[in-house]
Amino acid sequence: MCGSKSEINPVQAGEGMQAEKSSENRIAYYHLPGLFEFYDLYKAFLPVFRGHREYFYEWCEIGSIYGAQADCLWGGGRVGFGEEPAKHVAALMREYGISARLTFSNSLLREEHLSDRKCNRLCALFEKSGATGNDSMLNTHGVVENGIILTSDLLMDYIKSKYPGFYFVSSTTKVLTDFGQLEDELKREDFRYVVPDFRLNKAFDRLFALPDVWKDKVEFLCNECCSFDCKQRRKCYENVSRKSLGEDREDHVCPSAQAGSGYRFSDAMKNPGFIGNDDIRNIYLPNGFSQFKIEGRSLGSAVVLEFLLYYMTRPEYQLRVREEIYLDSSLDLF
C-alpha cells in the first residue's frame, strides 16, 4: 500500500537543516527517459551537450538513458512505444559513452516468459555494446556498462546467469514507501542502484543517516506527477505489466482529481516529492547523494526537452539549446 504524508513524515527542506558537506566538486548524474522512445531527440541533443559543454551546468552529467522497445514482454512501468532499431540505439549510446538501461520492470513474469526472443536479443546486443570512457558507469576494464531496470527476482537471476555483463537497478515500480523496505533493498548486493518511491524523497532525517555506501546507491525519482497520497500506484504498474504480457485489460483508471489533465511539469513542481535544481545542489549533493532519475517515457519529446533544459541547461543558454534542437528538421517534437 502506498504511504501517506503522515506515514513518511518528511523533513521539509530549509527548516533549520544544514548541509553536512560541501557540494563543491560533486557531480549529479541524471538518468534520462526514452532510450528507444526518444532516440531522435537524443540524436539531436547529445552533439549539443558534448560539443557545447559551456551551455550546461558543470555540476551535472548524464548517468544513463533508459527505456524499452515497443511490445517488450519483460517491459513494465510504462507502456513502451519505441520503434527505433536496437542497433541504432546501441550505436548512439556507444558513440557518446553513455550507459544504456533496458527497462524490464514487469512484475508478473513467469518461467515461460524468460525465453522471449525479442528481449533476449536486446540483452545479447546491449550486454556487448558498452563504450570506453571515463564515466561513473565504467567497469574494471574501462568500459561503460549497460544496465537493466527490473522488479522481478526471477528475471534478475536469469539475466545474471545468461548475460553477466549488466548491472541492475531496483525499479521504482516496487513502490518502496516504507523506509525499512528501502533499507532492506539497499542491503542487497545485486543492485547497483535502488529507486525508492518518490514519497521518500524528503525523508531527510532517515536519508541523511544512511551510510555513505548506501547513499551512493539511492537514485531519486525527481519529477513524479502522481498524487502524493495515491493508494493505487502498485495497481497501476501491475496493469502495465499485464498489458506487456499481452493480456486484454482496460486501462487503469486513476482516481486522482488531476488525472484528467495528464502530465504537466508545472504541476509536478508542486508535488511534495518534487526535486528541483536548488534541492539537488543545496541539499542532496552536499549530503552525499548523486543519482537522480527523470521520468517521462510515456510523454512527448517536447516535454522531455523541457526536462533537459530545466535540469541540465544554464538559463542563459536554454533558448540557444532549444533552437539547436528545433532546427533539426528530422525531429518531430510533438
Identify the function of each model-found stretch:
Residues 5-9, 15:
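Intrinsically disordered, low-complexity polyampholyte segments enriched for Lys and acidic residues
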